[in-house]
Amino acid sequence: MSIDIDDILAELDRDTTAVEQNASSYPDQSDRTQGNDVSQIRPADKAVDPVAPTQFNKIDDYQKLITHWKNERMSPELLPYPHHLMTRTLIRIQERIELIETLSMGYLEDNQELTVDSKLPLLCMEAELERLKFLVRSFIRCRLSKIDKYSIYLRQQSELPNNAGLSRLDLLMSKEEVKYHMKHSDILLKLFNNAVLKHLPEELQAVNDTEGSISMIDEPDWNKTVFILVCGGVVDESGIDSKLTTDDDGKHCYSVIIEDLNEEIYLLIGAVYVIRYSVIRDLMTEGRVVLI
């Protein structure tokens, strides 16, 4: 299923009025919303759609979205796009907008004149909707800024042999983000070529040269220092966290290796640490730690 990011941002940037406006895993992208507007989804489609909001706890989804937002803002790399979660969230936003419109027009009330007391729940709903919309806007804008920053790096990844790169991009980004990235990188490369590269010797015209002391490709800083909260709680089918261990004091923790120092350290459940991103990247992807 696909969502048009341009439409989303345009919709979310509008001023909210009473007649205009609650809504840690990385699922795959096998199901996406068809069309440019989530309002085009029919009730019959929602009933059989594996990402239908009614089949998931909205509070859990909201907490997952906050976790994705925190990780995206604090991580040096572009993280996998939560396709199913974002689809459910956008559907809930559309449904809540429609509900607020209905309530504000008084269609559900015998007396269609709204009193001060009857407006209070409506105002609370609008406030919660604005909170969710801010979260979605911030999440998408953060991702777009990383796509801009690492444009050449991502393009290089998309050109891996046997379509491995394109498959990776499809998992890493939404369909619209991939299209945005391709168009943006094309414009950027054309600008570089017209302004500078075509005036240089042929052997100096490559923009993806990694030889020499300085790479021309801006890659994520894998050794960036980040703050993390060790949350744990990830279990397999047998109900056991396979990576959970205990330290010398018998406290539950995760063991990680700092390769440069060849040193093993223990991350206690519930504790906060400052550590290199590359050391805890796998734990973050699995949902065992959260960036803060």
From Swiss-Prot:
Protein keywords: Chromosome partition, DNA replication, Nucleus
Subcellular location: Nucleus
Cell wall biogenesis/degradation is among the record's keywords: no
Region of interest called Disordered, as start-end residue ranges on this chain: 16-46
GO cellular component, one term: GINS complex
GO BP terms, alphabetized: chromosome segregation; DNA-templated DNA replication; double-strand break repair via break-induced replication
Ranges of biased composition (kind: Polar residues): 18-39
InterPro entries: GINS_A, GINS_bundle-like_dom_sf, GINS_Sld5, SLD5_C, Sld5_GINS_A
Main location: nucleus
Function recorded in the entry: The GINS complex plays an essential role in the initiation of DNA replication. Has a role in chromosome segregation.
Subunit structure and binding partners: Component of the GINS complex which is a heterotetramer of SLD5, PSF1, PSF2 and PSF3.
Protein family per UniProt: Belongs to the GINS4/SLD5 family.
Entry protein name: DNA replication complex GINS protein SLD5
Species this chain originates from: Kluyveromyces lactis (strain ATCC 8585 / CBS 2359 / DSM 70799 / NBRC 1267 / NRRL Y-1140 / WM37) (Yeast)
Phylogenetic classification of the source organism: Eukaryota, Fungi, Dikarya, Ascomycota, Saccharomycotina
